[in-house]
Amino acid sequence: PDGTLNKHKARLCAHGRMQQWGVSYWETYSPVVNMLTVRLLLALCNIHGLESKSIDFVLAFPQADLDVDIWMELPLGIEVAESPEQSRAYVLKLRKSLYGLKQASLNWFEKLKQGLVDRGFTPSEIDPCLYLKDDMVLLKYVDDCIIISPSIENIDRLIKSMQRGRENFRLTDEGDVNKFLGIEITKLDNHSFELSQPFLIDRILSFLGLCNNNFETDANSSLTPVAKGLLHQDLAGKSRKYSWNYRTAVGMLSYLQNSTRPEISMATHQTARFSNSPMLSHEKSIMRIGRYLLDTRKRGIIYKPDVSKGLECYVDADFAGGWSQADSENADNVLSRTGYIIMYADCPILWVSRLQTEIALSTAEAEYITLSQSLRDVIPLITLLKEINTVFPVHVKMPTFVCKVHEDNQSCITMATTTKFSPRTKHIALKYHHFCCYVK
């Protein structure tokens, strides 16, 4: 995760831009594991004291077979022995999926999936990158995998089976899981662990010019990631003055907040709204987030599982919080903000802060929309827990297969728990009532 060079790689890449749909490729999409699943499995691994290992597949894409006929010119430096001067007149038929092909990631996904299914694994219905078997689970993100089981011998046996099987997977055993997708996983005392990304934060600070290559800085830090008030379009404001790419900064901050820093979610989302035409005020907001990260670069989320607590969801909404009289004609300013966090055994596994897509007409309606959106994540999560429970127990002292939702708006609670008809709420779309049959 610190960006240190481990090894040099030489890759032959295809020109995927020259491919034609229906001729040299069909489907291209391949899923990756949800971060919710990663955090949930790490919490369960800690609760039950399970063993875990990470593996990395070497040159993953070329290990997969192609599903269509693709021909390629000879790469520069390769000649035909019989007639070297005519080498450019020859072509090669590809047998494996090269980097650069549009379907390369999908071919690799199917290759690994078939190899795991042949070894008795079953893919999850909720997360297709989670595989379950007996007392073992495996989750994958392209070519990086985490294997969890009560027995380290079973994990080693699976790794050897994949290396020596008919697929002849080329992989490296990375040992204990101490990093995954650039996230540091640090085991602490008292059965707790921490998720952090200090090296990504260093990269962000260097990108924004807040520190040098030695991470020395004379910039002032900020106590909070966002200033008082909300960002607006600011078309009459001053133009940008910084040279760094605005969208790149937003992308790095978005990955950081989605992985280990939920407290910057709202601030990051505000800046992301104006990626198309940022002004100086929007740049200053990003710089404020950077200054906040200066003093908190080594901080992350500390997970201390509490087995007395099960699945819980905390919900809140900010009704038309962006409205201002100075910019009252902008419809986006009256959108309410959704915010919720889902906890399992007192460990945060999912958090969201975003604007609602419809204009709510009251606080109760804004809260109800937020409640509905949060339960779109909760309901499949319950199914995911049931799937994992077939491999190893996920029960804590309170029932795990129900979710306690914390909502403080009484009108919203009434709408969610009763079928009482009200002329003031009949306009609420059917899609927000989807969870009512689950309420108890």
Question: What is the predicted role of each segment?
Answer:
Residues 1-139, 144-164:
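Metal/cofactor- and membrane transport-associated sequence elements
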Residues 12, 29, 38, 137, ...:
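Divalent metal-binding acidic/histidine catalytic loops
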Residues 58-59, 128-133, 176-181, 271-273:
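Short amphipathic alpha-helical segments embedded in low-complexity Lys/Glu-rich regions
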Residues 87-93, 177-180, 265-268:
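A short alpha-helix capping/helix-loop junction motif
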Residues 119-126, 146-201, 205-208, 213, ...:
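Polymerase palm active-site segment centered on the conserved acidic dipeptide of motif C
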